[in-house]
Amino acid sequence: MNYLIVGASGATGRLLTEQLLERGHFVKVIVRSPEKLPESVRNHENLTIIRAAVLDLSDAEMAQHVKGCDAVASCLGHNVTFKGMYGHPRKLVTDATRRLCQAIHTNKSDGMTKYVLMNTTANSNRDLNESRTLTEKAVFGLLRLVLPPHVDNEKAADYLRLEIGQNDNLIEWVAVRPDGLVDEDTVTEYELYPSPIVSSLFGSGKTSR
C-alpha cells in the first residue's frame, strides 16, 4: 500500500514511518527537516521525502503528493515551547487536515482514501455526547482561552466530523485519541475504546508510541 505521512519527523511520526517501511509499504513523507529522520529511514528504498512545510505547498502540489495514496496520516503537533504554543501557524493541524482532505477530493480517486488524525484525549467526541464533570468543563474552557494548540486539535477533529462526515464517498477517517504519550523500548499491547475510560485531566493513562 501507499501512504503519505505529515509530521513524520516527530516522535510518533518517525515510529509510524519506520513500521510501515518494515512491513513493505511505500511511504511518502512531507518534512521540513529530513535530517531528523533516522538514517535507516532516510535511505530506505521505499521512502519518498518531500522537503517542505506542509502548509507552504500549493494546492496543485498537495494534490500531486496525495495522488495514488491509499491512506494519509497526520502526526502533526505543536512544539512544547513558547513559540510552538503561541506562534504561527496556530492552526497547523486544522489547516493541514483541511488541505489534505481537499487534495483527496481534487484527485477524485476510484476508491476510498483513509485519513488518520493523531488527536488527544483532551478533545471530546461531540457526536457521542461524552460526559464531563463540571470541573473538567471549566478547566477545558480555560484551556481554550490560553492554549491555542488545544483549540487546534479540537477544530481539526471537528473539520472531519462536520465537513467530511460519516458518508463521504472519497474519505474514510478516524481521529485517534491517545493518552499521555511515552516511549517504551519494545512494542506493547494496546486496547481501543470509542471514548476515554479515565479522565484526561485527573488520573489519565499512558500510551506508548
How would you describe each model-predicted region?
Residues 191-209:
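A conserved pocket-lining segment of Rossmann-fold NAD(P)-dependent short-chain dehydrogenase/reductase
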Residues 2-26:
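N-terminal Rossmann NAD(P)H-binding glycine-rich loop of SDR-like oxidoreductase domains
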Residues 30-35:
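N-terminal Rossmann-fold cofactor-binding loop
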Residues 157-184:
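Conserved beta-loop-beta element that borders a ligand/cofactor-binding pocket
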Residues 70-73, 113-119, 174:
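Conserved catalytic-site loops of classical short-chain dehydrogenases/reductases
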Residues 29, 41-99, 103-106:
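NAD(P)H-binding glycine-rich loop region in Rossmannoid oxidoreductase-like domains
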Residues 26-28, 87, 98-148:
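Conserved Rossmann-fold NAD(P)-dependent oxidoreductase catalytic core, especially the SDR/UDP-sugar
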Residues 81, 121-128, 181-184:
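Conserved catalytic-site region of short-chain dehydrogenase/reductase
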